[in-house]
């Protein structure tokens, strides 16, 4: 979470959004750095757990956060503007083994649609950078299934941003035994 926040280049007092906040790991790290954190998740039970996590931490450190149940596909309905968005979005169900190929292809198509819609919404509300994780699936036929990230970015009005020549984007973030590989992208508006 700390790496993601740092890649978002947020400064103390700025506001970040995690539209897939889950149990609020990214929000906690942001708030510890003095960044105002807003989290949205479509699972009310998960929002309840996130609230418990943030309240526990808040009693010791901070209270600069806000949680709300909601749909990441409708962000502009909930949020006017944020400085940055930092998130690990929904990556599909948990897999105990490599993904069946046909399922991976269907999931890829679903996630491409979801991410395009969400990034279009993010485009309406974000002032600066977006840190977004895209998955790649290892399949049962030893073929990897990747999302068409170029199309997603083109359709949503974003491009890849690289803060330094020494940092190559995307940043691979996974264990060799992972069934879902994660790639961290830093995005900016076109």
List the model feature ranges, each with a label.
Residues 1-190:
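Class I S-adenosyl-L-methionine-dependent methyltransferase catalytic core
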């Amino acid at each position: 979470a700390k790496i993601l926040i740092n890649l978002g280049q947020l400064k103390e007092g700025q506001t970040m959004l995690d539209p897939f906040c889950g149990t609020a790991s990214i929000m906690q790290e942001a708030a510890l750095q003095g960044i105002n954190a807003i989290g949205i998740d479509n699972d009310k039970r998960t929002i309840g757990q996130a609230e418990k996590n943030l309240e526990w931490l808040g009693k010791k450190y901070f209270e600069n956060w806000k949680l709300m149940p909601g749909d990441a596909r409708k962000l502009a309905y909930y949020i006017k503007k944020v400085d940055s968005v930092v998130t690990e979005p929904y990556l599909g169900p948990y897999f105990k083994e490599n993904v069946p190929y046909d399922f991976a292809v269907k999931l890829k198509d679903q996630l491409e649609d979801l991410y395009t819609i969400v990034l279009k919404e993010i485009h309406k509300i974000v002032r600066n950078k977006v840190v977004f994780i895209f998955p790649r699936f290892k399949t049962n036929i030893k073929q990897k299934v990747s999302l068409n990230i170029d199309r997603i970015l083109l359709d949503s009005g974003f491009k890849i941003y690289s803060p330094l020549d020494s940092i190559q984007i995307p940043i691979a973030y996974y264990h060799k035994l992972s069934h879902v590989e994660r790639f961290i992208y830093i995005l900016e508006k076109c």
